[in-house]
From Swiss-Prot:
Residues 563-637 are annotated as: C. It comes from Shewanella sp. (strain MR-7). This is Chaperone protein HtpG. GO terms for cellular component: cytoplasm. InterPro entries: HATPase_C_sf, Heat_shock_protein_90_CS, HSP90_C, Hsp90_fam, Hsp90_N, Ribosomal_Su5_D2-typ_SF. The gene is htpG. GO terms for molecular function: ATP binding; ATP hydrolysis activity; ATP-dependent protein folding chaperone; unfolded protein binding.
């Protein structure tokens, strides 16, 4: 009795199918790469499960992928004898996109074919790529270990729905038949398929086979009889683990295709490193830095990590234990000789072998990035634009490598006059003034706010470079990166400016004299502002601005407060120190005011101006506007 059901595709699948058909038309042949890759994964998964249950092989342990075409019918079939799927598995995997953050993925689509094809590639088109060339797709599958009459038939024309039915299938595994559109019949050509397999699937460790027709008996050139040959399944790829081959034998094209196979990325990797480690631990790693950040890089639920093999046997995807979180963009694999074949995520979590391998792999990736930064600054900037903000998590997470990570960071700076983050800490050190012992920086809401901050006035006048930070993560970074190569990082908006030997003796004396003369004014402002400030001081950092606010040493900065509030964390009340510039005409006129009410209004106006400049917003903007209008009106009378 038939058990046919019709199901509607998940909304996101409908969108993805539509976009793929219209966006990936320039590279249609990737459908075969994706389907062969999935078939190889199914073989890997069966091999892993059979480690503890040999019966799953059902007497056939020779795993392989077979591809055949029928020109007359216009079909291509990709068949594997891997793990197969159950009915529930078919509905789940071939009807929905089981990935977190799909809404964000679709939000990022621009409608521009070239950009969207890249994004779709990053998402991993997988099985759905079949519809790039097929008007209809038929899947027959049986899960390993299940009865022949528990197999499943899945069919769809890639529109709004698919059907599922129960069938009988003697062999385990999955068979996918693509009924090609009329304009895509080129893919039913045997030689076309062979060229695609050679191009995309040479590195796959499972044999990929195509049917080789036999030849009838025939006469040779000297009249002798050449016997007939039988047809057979011919292996079309090298079918060896690429990472176990000698580096000198592997071309760049093979490395790039293997990257696309394991990452499901649509673009080439930026760089890679292939190494065999011998000693206390023996393992091989093949690590890739992508050229583009995945669309869900910041999604907390996103899985990341390396593929783990033990003695060439696939164990698991996303083994995050071998890579710190700040390097989560790294793709690749690790093949260990030391871990047991029955290793689990729990065993990996607290294992001295894992920890030693993690340390070695982390150093390897940092070394790759250091070499790239040294040898190809332009390419490194390309990397930084994609992954720089993730790398900034490193100093908080990896104390042992803090200095190395810091050397890889890039910032905007007053030296370049550009918003582009191209300045390294070593660049900064090389330009430090004689007698300078600190690395000065500012964190603000935007590059413009940082570059135009009044806190930079004195430093600009003295020609002292300041690093300009404006990313959300910068305040977090700077809380964990307090020095570099024995030079302290010093915020120009926090505490005393501390110029040390850069401070001119005559200037210092004049500053102290001005502070002494302004003491009565400072006390008046303190009284006028009351509890709204922690203190009032004469500034040493302003030259052109009447006043600024400064965060006290040990206090939470305005940027950190914003971060905490955005995360829904409780934030303590922090009162700023208000610094005035008595040399500015506004402050000088303020000192002459005898009307204490007007004096208090002007003091408040200057304070709120300074807070607006520092934070980009006010707690009560309406009160500020009301005060401003009141002052304007009073001066217009």
């Amino acid at each position: 009795m038939s058990q046919q059901e019709t199901h509607g595709f998940q909304t996101e699948v409908k969108q993805l199918l539509h976009l793929m058909i219209h966006s990936l038309y320039s590279n249609k042949e990737i459908f075969l790469r994706e389907l062969v890759s999935n078939a190889a994964d199914a073989a890997d998964k069966l091999r892993y499960l059979a480690l503890t249950n040999d019966a799953l092989y059902e007497g056939d342990g020779e795993l392989r992928v077979r591809i055949s075409a029928d020109k007359e019918k216009g079909t291509v079939t990709i068949e594997d004898n891997g793990v197969g799927m159950t009915r529930d598995g078919v509905i789940e995997h071939l009807g929905t996109i089981a990935k977190s953050g799909t809404a964000e993925f679709f939000k990022n689509l621009s409608g521009e074919a070239s950009k969207d094809s890249q994004l779709i590639g990053q998402f991993g088109v997988g099985f759905y790529s079949a519809f790039i060339v097929a008007k209809k797709v038929t899947v027959r599958t049986r899960a390993a270990g299940h009865k022949a009459n528990e197999a499943v038939l899945w069919e769809s024309e890639g529109e709004g729905s698919f059907t599922v039915d129960t069938i009988t299938k003697a062999s385990r595994g999955t068979e996918i038949t693509l009924h090609l559109r009329d304009e895509e019949k080129e893919f039913a050509d045997e030689w076309r398929l062979r060229s695609i397999i050679t191009k995309y699937s040479d590195h796959i460790s499972v044999p990929v086979e195509m049917w080789q027709e036999g030849t009838p008996e025939r006469d040779g050139p000297d009249g002798e009889k050449i016997p007939a040959t039988e047809g057979y399944w011919k292996v079309m790829n090298k079918a060896t683990a690429l990472w176990m081959r000698n580096k000198s034998e592997i071309s760049d094209e093979e490395y790039q295709e293997f990257y696309k196979h394991i990452s499901h990325d649509y673009t080439d990797a930026l760089l890679w490193s292939h190494n065999r480690v011998e000693g206390k631990q023996e393992y091989t790693n093949l690590l890739y830095i992508p050229s583009k950040a995945p669309w869900d890089l910041w999604n907390r639920d996103r899985k990341h990590g390396l593929k783990l093999f033990v003695q060439r046997v696939f164990i698991m995807d996303d083994a995050e234990q071998f890579m710190p979180s700040y390097l989560r963009f790294v793709q690749g694999l690790i093949d260990s000789n030391d871990l047991p074949l029955n290793v689990s995520r729990e065993i990996l979590q607290d294992n001295h072998i894992t920890k030693a391998m993690r340390t070695g792999i982390t150093k390897r990736v940092l070394g790759m990035l250091e070499k790239l930064a040294k040898d190809d600054a332009e390419k490194y900037q390309q990397f930084w634009a994609e992954f720089g903000q993730v790398l900034k998590e490193g100093p908080a997470e990896d104390f042992a490598n803090r200095e190395r990570i810091a050397g890889l960071l890039r910032f905007a700076s007053t030296h370049t006059g550009s918003a582009a983050p191209t300045v390294s800490l070593d660049d900064y050190l090389s330009r430090m003034k004689e007698g300078q012992n600190k690395i000065y920086y500012i964190v603000a809401d935007s590059h413009e706010a940082a570059a135009n901050s009044p806190h930079l006035e004195l430093l600009r006048k003295k020609g002292i470079e300041v690093l300009l930070m404006s990313e959300r993560i910068d305040e977090w970074l700077i809380n964990h990166l307090t020095e570099y190569k024995e030079k302290q990082l010093h915020s120009v908006t926090r505490g005393e400016l501390e110029l040390g030997e850069l401070e001119d003796a005559a200037e210092k004396e004049a500053q102290e004299k001005l502070a002494e003369e302004s003491a009565p004014l400072v006390e008046r402002i303190k009284a006028a502002l009351g509890a709204s400030v922690a203190d009032v001081k004469v500034t040493s950092r302003l030259t052109d601005t009447p006043a600024c606010v400064v965060t006290g040493e040990g206090e939470m900065s305005s940027q950190m407060i914003k971060l905490m509030q955005a995360a829904g964390q409780p934030v303590p009340e922090v009162k700023p120190t208000f610094e005035i510039n008595p040399a500015h005409p506004l402050v000088s006129r303020l000192n002459d005011l005898q009307d204490e009410a007007a004096f208090a209004d002007w003091s408040n106006l200057l304070l709120q101006q300074a807070q607006l400049s520092e934070k980009g917003s006010l707690a009560d903007p309406s009160a500020f506007i009301k005060l401003m209008n009141q002052m304007l009106l009073a001066n217009l009378k």
